[in-house]
Amino acid sequence: MPQLQCEEIRFPSADGVHTVAASMYTMPGVPVRAVLQLSHGMCEYVQRYRPMAQWYAQRGIALAGNDHLGHGGTANKGEHGHYGEPRGRYHLLNDLHTMNGIIHQKFPGVPVFLYGHSMGSFYARWYAETWPESISGAIFSGTAGPHIRNQAGWAVAALTAAVRGPKYVSKTLVKLNMGAYCNRIPDAVSPNAWISRDPEVVKAYDADALCTFPFTAATYREMLATLCHVSSRKWAQNIRKDLPVLLIAGTADPVGDYGAGVRKVWAMLGDAGVQDLSC
């Protein structure tokens, strides 16, 4: 069986400071009939998805994505967990658009489907609103729905960043945002036990320095501002009505409120008239 091929790509970030690290996975000898553009989650990076890329590439679906600002190979030393300088969320969004352009240039005429997971799904949802014609469909994986805690969390993060500084790491913010994630896991051996039912995946995550860093106050502010935006009815109404959208989530995933939040997003999009919608 041919080996999975990974092309590493670099391009300037929209922030004018960083160089974005990106990866593009294909299988030699297998024609590419579609591309899955990945928007990865919080505290991880694209190359964690190599097993998933292998599965798709064998079936003629390339997987390509960039490490977000503050993550993976895009973050400079000592900067992991921070993309919260002014307009940080906009830079992250624009980097996704640059990556999309690179994909279209590499595979002209091939449909591109945007796949956003967890935090990455918040930005994928915003992207689908902003540049709908650049994608053939969207998959929102492990996303979160509208909730009063989104606005409350943003307010606390914004205040903390203003008072303590944008790069301040607040244990209170970590607890408010993720402190309850293991509540339904009896005898959880790791604070990250919620990420997977497979203990080996949790062990690998815990051992990976590119995953085990905290977010700064300003990064929480930017992430939660994005979540608040894509939790609005206005966002849902702005989604292209004929855009195929698939929502998926683990039934034990706390980010999506154990499925309840995901169903709220599905209902919002349905109420807004999105026609090709699956959950």
Please report, for each region that a protein language model flagged, where it lies by residue.
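Short beta-strand/loop motif that positions the catalytic acidic residue
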Residues: 247-249
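N-terminal cap/lid segment of alpha/beta-hydrolase-fold proteins
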Residues: 1-29
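Active-site glycine-rich loops that stabilize anionic/oxyanionic intermediates
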Residues: 36-44, 118-119, 251-252
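Alpha/beta-hydrolase fold nucleophile elbow
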Residues: 107-118
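Alpha/beta-hydrolase-fold enzymes
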Residues: 124-210
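Conserved alpha/beta-hydrolase
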Residues: 48-79
